[in-house]
A protein has these predicted regions:
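Short cysteine-rich clusters marking metal-coordination/redox-active sites
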Residues: 14
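Active-site neighborhoods and metal-handling regions in enzymes and metal-associated proteins
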Residues: 6-10, 18-232
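Conserved N-terminal segment of EGF-like repeats
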Residues: 1-5
Length: 232
């Protein structure tokens, strides 16, 4: 039997906190997880599942997160600095009752990550880094609201960019959309990774193998890790 925490009777209150009986809530899901485990599948632990209340809290956090990126979109232009972007994100986040998750996280000194041109990720904003016409910059924004985490990034083109850079940005967005389209109940993480990798390579690009996506919600970085290389 797959060991996924305490064992519940059919008429016990479900472990998820819904108040429903186990047989009316997560029993069928746990039975399916056990079947997969017995087949040799890697099964993620029960505590990664989010309750309805958790999901609503994460959505509220995500609304602030997206709003902060929209705030940047209204202001970013040639001549601004990545330090400006950091201040915009910080002020928007705080004004909406939230906390910038990166600030002081494992020593990170700023409220957002800004990665310009060839920087892959986790660039540190600076008042000395001035954006110029033709730059592309990734703004990686993470937000805590009422204890719930959200995390997203967005690519920005500064003024007019070269066709090559524009195509890179466009294909990257398409890769994200391909990965999202591959997500389905009882699917595999490899389905998502493969969709991202296949779309990138079909377009003539490569993926960064050392980094990937991750779970989020109750903590900043949760399992599972979602790589950009995989088999369906």
């Amino acid at each position: 039997m797959y060991d996924n925490g305490p064992v519940f009777g059919r008429n016990d209150e479900c472990w998820c906190g819904s108040g429903k009986k186990y047989k009316k809530c997560h029993l069928a899901i746990d039975e399916r997880l056990n079947e997969l485990w017995e087949r040799g599948e890697e099964v993620l632990p029960r505590d990664l599942l989010k309750t309805s209340a958790d999901l609503e809290g994460i959505r509220r956090s995500a609304a602030v997160n997206v709003g902060a990126l929209d705030y940047v979109a209204e202001r970013i232009a040639p001549g601004c600095t990545t330090g400006d972007i950091d201040r915009w994100v910080h002020e928007y986040t705080v004004e909406h009752g939230a906390i910038p998750a990166p600030l002081n996280y494992e020593g990170f000194p700023k409220s957002v990550c800004t990665s310009v041109n060839c920087v892959v990720c986790h660039g540190i904003p600076s008042d000395d880094e001035v954006l110029v016409e033709g730059d592309i910059v990734n703004v990686d924004c993470s937000t805590i609201l009422d204890g719930y985490y959200s995390d997203s990034s967005r690519m920005f083109c500064v003024g007019e960019v070269s066709p090559e850079r524009q195509r890179l940005v466009d294909v990257t967005r398409e890769c994200v959309e391909a990965g999202l389209a591959a997500i389905k109940p009882w699917g595999h993480l490899g389905d998502i990774s493969h969709a991202v990798q296949a779309h990138a390579e079909e377009a003539g690009f490569n993926v960064v193998r050392e980094f990937g996506g991750h779970g989020i919600g109750i903590e900043f970085h949760e399992d599972p890790f979602v790589g950009f290389v995989g088999q369906p």
